[in-house]
Amino acid sequence: MPQKIRVLIADDHRLFAQALEAILATDDRLLVAGQASDGAEAVQLTLSLDPDVVLMDIAMPVMDGLQATRQIRKQRPKACVLMLTGSNSKTDVDRAREAGAAGYVTKDRIAAELIDAILEVVGR
């Protein structure tokens, strides 16, 4: 049996993070490795837990998701960060890519696209 894909959830909205965890729990290939409530905590947990994928909200306190992604990618160049946001403007997509995000899912499409997006960025 292949090893589970370990996912770190980084979102400052606790209820939304719980909803993400519930979506991920529907797929046996995925395992939630941890949760961060701000960008700085996301960096810290990524370095300590070494998840396969980080689901990163863009708008968070302390440090936003773009800054956190840059820091993660600087210290772990192969880290897979999948951006989650309420916006699907081209500017936000470009900013996410420039920060080093491997992919991008808008919050209105999460239920339909999240698991496929995770599998795509880890190459499974």
List each language-model region with its residue ranges.
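C-terminal output helix
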Residues: 91, 109-119
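Acidic catalytic/metal-coordinating carboxylates
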Residues: 38-41, 63-67
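Receiver (REC) domain active-site loop signature in two-component systems and cognate sites
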Residues: 60
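Short amphipathic alpha-helix used as the core "switch/output" element in two-component signaling
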Residues: 44, 66-77
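Active-site beta3 strand of CheY-like receiver
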Residues: 49-55
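Short, conserved "switch-loop" micro-motifs in signal-transduction and mechanochemical regulators
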Residues: 87-88
